[in-house]
Amino acid sequence: IKAGSPVDSVLGELAPLLEEGDVVIDGGNSQWEDTERRITFCEDQGLLFVGCGVSGGEEGALNGPALMPGGSAGAWELIQPIFEAIAARTRKGAVCVNWIGQGGSGHFVKMVHNGIEYGDMQMICDTYQVMRDGLGMSNVAMSEVFGRWNRGKLDSYLIEITRDILAYEDEEGICPVDYILDAAGQKGTGKW
């Protein structure tokens, strides 16, 4: 369900079918203020509502996401075993989920997470442009730099995939990154 009014429409249809104490979970990229409003709507009907930030992309879909639930008091004890079973785990085995708090806190934390991620992506783009246009570096040389950074304090998924993208050549020895349009779209979740 797309974030925004479609969530409200489905919630309006779903609520009459539920029983007191049931939990509704919004795992989309909803605005935290919308989550606050939906909590009030549900609690007025005896329901619990959880707004849960979900992170992990394709890897998270395959191996478990990082989850950031927040919402109605009392909901966590009901959903905790399920969320812990499906969440990603760290290399040391710690589960990648924790109750963030009441209200729209889960979606608020996801909004902050997205803002940091968008900032990181912009820094990577700016660095790429300086290396390519300012320093005249080749894709292979840039890939090696990102590879070194990924073995240190800057170790991250975004640095890793940037390294891999810059190193990739097709069967004809062409690096597709040289043909990617220098433009980006967005779904609107970064506007808040």
For the regions a language model picked out, list residue spans one by one.
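Glycine-rich, N-terminal phosphate-binding loop of Rossmann-like dinucleotide-binding domains
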Residues: I1-K2, G28
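Intrinsically disordered, low-complexity terminal tails/loops enriched in metal-binding residues
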Residues: A15
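A conserved active-site cap/scaffold subdomain adjacent to cofactor or substrate pockets
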Residues: V177-W192
